[in-house]
């Protein structure tokens, strides 16, 4: 493991020097001599389409300031009005009625209850993920009111409709406008002028319901985090989203830069394929892998204390008894225990090659990762190094983000790492279901791992119809305990997230949910 740490430190140091030299004299080149009318942002981008119902591409539509939902999440992940000005649940808890603000789409078409109805129905028709979030019965519209009827009580429906999957679009324009290539007709402050995965150019929405601070917006895809930091240093961009931990030191001068950083509600986790016939189907092998990994050192050394070491499913930034679950966590780092568990499971190094084997085959695990987030390759390489010490061979496979979802759904992995929101609907319910609730005939397609626990499923069903916050909290904690006792997932750590801006702009702040990058609140500096 020392070689991995030295390698990581050397790469970070080299990147820092490169950016520092490249940035000499930089940092203020984007400041305009006259009024600033163009905002330029550097991001990492996984979307080659702006169709919001495809994959998770709605996130980019919202991040670019094109789309909005019925509800918005504040800095505490409370749902607040956005396109909807208010909402209420029926007495029987089987429907929710939303009152829609008198606003317009970017093409000037009014946003009515009927328009919202069509948009949500379109999402359900095109996106399997919508059906996995809640069971829709039907929708009615009456003027500026829209009522959503569900097949069973859904306590968190307003929050679910804050997921970018449910961006409200002008369905009648679909076909006249190619949503994938030209972007949907939404209600955000900006509208797409041109789009490619590498670059998106946008103009101010003339029909927006509030002042739009910039006439033009340019989104540059800069997937390499060091290059993204360099671009900000040189003044080529005004804002960099998610600067790597090793580069944050470059932006400490408060006269030139502003760093918005928060403890996120994200996990970096690896799904574990436990299907019959897979090595990780044996709980002892899963436990051995978990105990072989020194996650505390990863957080402190590789990631320079910008992560907290993992254990429970939900991060410490959320109120779900993190300390209690971490204290009870059974699979903390213990390499000797890992070796004993492998031996108990019948895995021994019979040929002296350094890897344990059984029936003539080494214990090998395919680890799928993508490099769009700087920490993922580091975690993957650290896993490979530490697992080798107990005799587990890890085969690393770097893939494009666009194929990651399909790999996960099909279960074509042993380990699959991702950086994911745990409270994407203002509540962890979607997260605790998507990878661990039993997938019955495609009912939960994100669970391609084969994991199934009847007690967990029963709690999930109970959670879906429970409206009392205290009882919901207790149910979720019980679900977390089941997964960690089953050694059913690998939580590497809980990251901070950040947005760094130069002094030509103000109010560039990151939110916990990571949906809101470009907003109407980001304005030219006064």
Please tell me what each predicted stretch does:
Residues 348-423, 497:
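Ligand/substrate-recognition segments at binding pockets and active sites
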Residues 309-350, 371-377:
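Structural transition elements
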Residues 74-78, 162-212, 216, 334-336, ...:
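Gly/Pro-rich hinge or "lid" segments in bacterial periplasmic/extracellular proteins
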Residues 42-89, 121, 185, 513-515:
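N-terminal lobe/hinge region of extracytoplasmic solute-binding protein
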Residues 88, 92, 131-172:
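Surface-exposed binding/hinge segments that line
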């Amino acid at each position: 493991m020392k070689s991995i740490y030295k390698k990581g430190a050397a790469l970070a140091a080299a990147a820092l020097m490169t950016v520092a030299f490249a940035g000499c004299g930089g940092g203020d080149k984007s400041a305009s001599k006259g009024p600033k009318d163009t905002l330029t942002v550097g991001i990492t981008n996984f979307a080659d389409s702006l169709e919001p119902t495809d994959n998770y591409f709605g996130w980019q539509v919202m991040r670019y300031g094109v789309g909005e939902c019925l509800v918005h999440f504040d800095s505490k992940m409370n749902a607040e009005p956005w396109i909807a000005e208010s909402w209420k649940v029926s007495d029987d808890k089987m429907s929710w009625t939303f009152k829609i603000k008198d606003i317009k789409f970017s093409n000037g078409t009014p946003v009515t209850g009927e328009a919202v109805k069509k948009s949500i129905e379109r999402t359900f028709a095109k996106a399997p993920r919508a059906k996995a979030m809640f069971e829709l019965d039907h929708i009615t519209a009456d003027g500026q009111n829209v009522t959503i009827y569900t097949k069973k009580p859904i306590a968190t429906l307003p929050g679910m409709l804050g997921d970018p999957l449910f961006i409200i679009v002008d369905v009648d324009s679909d076909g006249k406008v190619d949503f994938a290539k030209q972007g949907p007709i939404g209600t955000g402050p900006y509208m797409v002028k041109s789009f490619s995965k590498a670059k998106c150019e946008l103009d101010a929405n003339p029909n927006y319901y509030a002042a739009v601070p910039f006439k033009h917006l340019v989104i540059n895809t800069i997937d390499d985090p060091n290059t993204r930091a360099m671009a900000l240093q040189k003044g080529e961009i005004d804002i960099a989203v998610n600067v790597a931990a090793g580069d944050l030191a470059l932006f400490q001068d408060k006269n030139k830069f502003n760093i918005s950083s928060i403890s996120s509600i994200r996990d970096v986790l690896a799904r574990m394929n436990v299907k019959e016939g897979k090595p990780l189907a044996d709980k002892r092998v899963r436990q051995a892998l978990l105990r072989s990994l020194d996650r505390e050192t990863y957080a402190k050394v590789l990631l320079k204390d910008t992560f907290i070491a993992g254990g429970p499913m939900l991060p410490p930034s959320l109120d779900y008894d993190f300390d209690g679950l971490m204290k009870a966590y059974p699979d903390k780092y213990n390499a000797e225990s890992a070796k004993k568990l492998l031996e108990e499971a019948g895995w021994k190094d019979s040929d002296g090659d350094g890897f344990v084997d059984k029936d003539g085959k080494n214990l090998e695990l395919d680890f799928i990762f993508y490099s769009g987030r700087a920490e993922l390759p580091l975690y993957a390489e650290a896993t490979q190094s530490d697992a080798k010490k107990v005799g587990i061979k890890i085969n690393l496979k770097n893939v494009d983000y666009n194929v990651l979802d399909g790999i996960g759904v099909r279960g074509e992995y042993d380990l699959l790492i991702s950086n994911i929101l745990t409270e994407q609907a203002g509540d962890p319910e979607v997260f605790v279901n998507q990878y661990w609730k039993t997938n019955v005939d495609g009912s939960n397609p994100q669970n391609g791992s084969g994991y199934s626990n009847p007690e967990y499923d029963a709690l999930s069903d109970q959670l879906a119809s429970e409206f009392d916050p205290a009882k919901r909290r207790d149910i979720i904690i019980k679900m977390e305990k089941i997964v960690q006792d089953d050694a059913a997932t690998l939580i590497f750590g809980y990251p901070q997230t950040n947005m760094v801006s130069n002094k030509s702009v103000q109010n560039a702040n990151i939110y916990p949910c990571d949906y809101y990058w470009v907003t109407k609140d980001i304005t030219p500096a006064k």
